[in-house]
Amino acid sequence: MSFRGRGGFNRGGGGGRGGGGFGGRGGGRGGYGQGGGRGGFGRGGGRGGFNRGGYDQGPPESVVEVGEFMHPCEDDVVCKCITQENRVPYFNAPIYLENKEQIGKVDEIFGQLRDFYFSIKLSENMKASSFKKLQKFYIDPAKLLPLQRFLPRPPGEKGPPRGGGRGGGRGGGRGRGGGRGGGGGFRGGRGGGFGGGGGFRGSRGGGFRGGRGFRGGR
């Protein structure tokens, strides 16, 4: 998995139009991910984004419900997001059981903006077959972002751009928010290809991407 250009993206690269949505590995116009796109989630870390990885800090002081187990997918599990106010988990955010035992990390997010799913890349000692239907998983509440961060800004509203943001450290993108186009959904994804209008495609590594996207591979 690699990136060209500073800041986790370069200004070239094809991205679909369309604001507001997530998508996994599945293709389709209006998605952010391998093909690029404006102001959404991206595949991989890069400079100046959220979730560049880092060391394990241990379990948090408290955890909140983030998802329900739906089904296994290869060695990962697919969950329906059940956060309050549809808050969005960071990519690579640790996922726990209720007893704060870490089971893995957020890998991909896909589906409709207000009805979305995510996959968990399990830790080496975990098996997807060991979980039950609708079993709940948990997350550090500090690893959740408000859904409004990924919605297009209303006409005439002033303030910093949504979706991309300036990022942290060097090379943060200036993102243009939700981008042009209609309302959204997540595209593709291993969890079953939830469609919808244009959107962000996102997965491993994390962070928000500004500009027109990035070229990324594995």
Swiss-Prot record:
Q: Tell me the segments the record calls region RGG-box 1.
A: 4-49
* InterPro entries per UniProt: Gar1/Naf1_Cbf5-bd_sf (IPR038664), H/ACA_rnp_Gar1/Naf1 (IPR007504), Transl_B-barrel_sf (IPR009000)
List the GO terms this entry assigns under cellular component, sorted alphabetically.
nucleolus; telomerase holoenzyme complex
Span list, region Disordered: 1-57, 149-218
Q: Where in the cell?
A: Nucleus, Nucleolus
Keyword field: Nucleus, Repeat, Ribonucleoprotein, Ribosome biogenesis, RNA-binding, rRNA processing
Q: Where is the composition biased (Gly residues)?
A: 1-56, 161-218
Biological process terms from the Gene Ontology for this record are: pseudouridine synthesis; rRNA processing; telomere maintenance via telomerase
GO MF term set: RNA binding
Question: Record's Gene3D superfamilies?
Answer: Probable tRNA pseudouridine synthase domain
One Pfam match, by short name? Gar1
Region RGG-box 2, annotated ranges: 162-214
Q: Which purpose does this protein serve, as stated in its record?
A: Required for ribosome biogenesis. Part of a complex which catalyzes pseudouridylation of rRNA. This involves the isomerization of uridine such that the ribose is subsequently attached to C5, instead of the normal N1. Pseudouridine ('psi') residues may serve to stabilize the conformation of rRNAs.
- Similarity section: Belongs to the GAR1 family.
How it assembles, according to the record, is: Component of the small nucleolar ribonucleoprotein particle containing H/ACA-type snoRNAs (H/ACA snoRNPs). Component of the telomerase holoenzyme complex.
Protein's UniProt name: H/ACA ribonucleoprotein complex subunit 1
Which organism encodes this protein?
Xenopus tropicalis
